[in-house]
């Protein structure tokens, strides 16, 4: 067995379920779930229609890269949404559809981290649990960037010592952040990019709340 499995922490939503067990909301009040980011609105009709119209394809495996149409639509949307300008994203080289962000965020660490060089993987705290789990199973040590009220619930890159940056191989970033809702500014993003260029680490920018 992989000994790194012993380093994993209990999944927080299992702990939350245990904490909520036996809790009954007051009569007449509808509880609002603030845990897993699950859509609370009905699926738009045009999506349901598109899916039901392709049910015959459920018997076959899709391509790993996704269809050219999907990749092109993703690249076009991203280019417009984030103002990437001429060229934008190359749908052939820079777009890879995945089954939810968890899969991609985990794979980043497995692909990037060299466990033989005492690596650090940095992440905000509080954080999405997969950041820590991916780092641990890649053989890295998680390095937590505390999101404190004094710092406006944003990571303080200036507080990280130079030795930590030199050991860093991957930084997980979530902006807009969950659960704080804060957005990292352009100057802070540019600083992180400059640090990545200087110390040769990868930034995994988790932007699942951008909309």
Regions found by a protein language model. Name each.
Residues 16, 20, 131, 192, ...:
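Aromatic/hydrophobic pocket-lining residues that form π-stacking "cages" and hydrophobic walls in ligand
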Residues 119, 198-202:
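A short helix->loop->beta-strand "cap" motif at the edges of active sites that frequently abuts
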Residues 41-44, 180-182, 199:
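Short catalytic/ligand-binding loop motif for oxyanion handling, primarily in non-cytosolic enzymes
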Residues 59-194, 210-211:
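Conserved core of the PLP fold type I
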Residues 23, 138, 198-199:
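Helix C-cap/helix->beta junction micro-motif
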Residues 207:
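Walker B catalytic acidic pair
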Residues 172, 203-204:
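Walker B beta-strand of ABC/ABC-like P-loop ATPase nucleotide-binding domains
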Residues 4-100:
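N-terminal small-domain helix-loop-helix segment of the aminotransferase-like
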């Amino acid at each position: 067995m992989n000994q790194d499995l012993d380093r994993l922490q209990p999944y927080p939503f299992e702990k939350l379920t245990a904490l909520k067990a036996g809790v009954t909301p007051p009569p007449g009040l509808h509880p609002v779930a603030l845990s897993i980011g699950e859509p609370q609105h009905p699926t738009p009709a045009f999506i349901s229609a598109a899916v039901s119209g392709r049910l015959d394809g459920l018997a076959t495996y899709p391509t790993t890269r996704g269809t050219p149409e999907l990749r092109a639509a993703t690249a076009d949307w991203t280019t417009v949404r984030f103002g990437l300008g001429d060229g934008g994203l190359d749908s052939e080289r820079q777009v890879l559809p995945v089954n939810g962000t968890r899969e991609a965020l985990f794979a980043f660490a497995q692909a990037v981290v060299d466990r033989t060089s005492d690596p650090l993987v940095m992440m905000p705290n509080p954080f999405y649990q997969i950041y820590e789990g991916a780092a641990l199973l890649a053989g890295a040590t998680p390095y937590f960037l505390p999101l404190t009220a004094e710092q406006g619930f944003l990571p303080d890159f200036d507080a990280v010592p130079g030795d930590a940056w030199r050991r860093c191989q991957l930084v997980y970033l979530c902006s807009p952040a969950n659960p704080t809702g804060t957005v990292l500014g352009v100057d802070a993003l540019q600083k992180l990019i400059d640090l990545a260029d200087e110390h040769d680490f990868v930034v995994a920018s988790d932007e699942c709340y951008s909309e």
